[in-house]
Amino acid sequence: TPVCSPSRAALLSGRFPQHTPVVNNNIKLDDKIVTFAEVLRRKGYATGYAGKWHLDGDGKPQWAPARKFGFTDNRFMFNRGHWKKFEDTKNGPRVAPRRNGRPYYGVEGADEKSFSTDWLTDKVIGFVNANKGKPFCYMVSYPDPHGPNTVRAPYDKMFANVRVPIPASVNKTRAQTPAWAAKAPRVTADTIRVLMPKYYGMVKCLDDNVGRILAALRQNGQLEQTIIVFTSDHGDLCGEHGRLN
């Protein structure tokens, strides 16, 4: 679906969103839903989850939701948000950047240990190493690539000189736009040229970190015995039709 929660409900349950009953964002997954993780947990698999969940209402970030849906180790699961920097504390994980005492989407000072994509990958590798030789299922849900289009160095400037293609549909008039989208903010070609190199950087950072997971599995001798599914809850318009999201 075009939005997060219904897609996630469908991926986890194998049902159409309307039967979960998550038909829009910030709706709680029905307690009766049996996820693939719950099926595997019952079969003796070690299960875990890290990253964005978006199936427990409007809590934000809301770490480690009480309803686990089969993901036994959900310490690094958070319900909502596209956070850019995390840290471990004696009281558990938290969003590192604070503004007026509240978490926000800042990327300042993020590095290969604290940037969200890298931090979550470390949690995956830790779980993989802890369960070497055992059946396991771990799901990691990276917030990126997603707005805000920011990423840590060196990815933030890696594609600065790339020529960004501008979609023809960016210049659609209001009359050419469906009524439901006509009042939404529109982006210009100049905005696309600024934001897309950072988007490419987010994708490259993600790609490198997936490579780290594969390397860890290979080093442990687990790669050939592991099924890896790479998917997404939805895409990004990247300027098509004058929209980003």
Describe these PLM feature segments.
Residues 1-245:
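Formylglycine-dependent sulfatase
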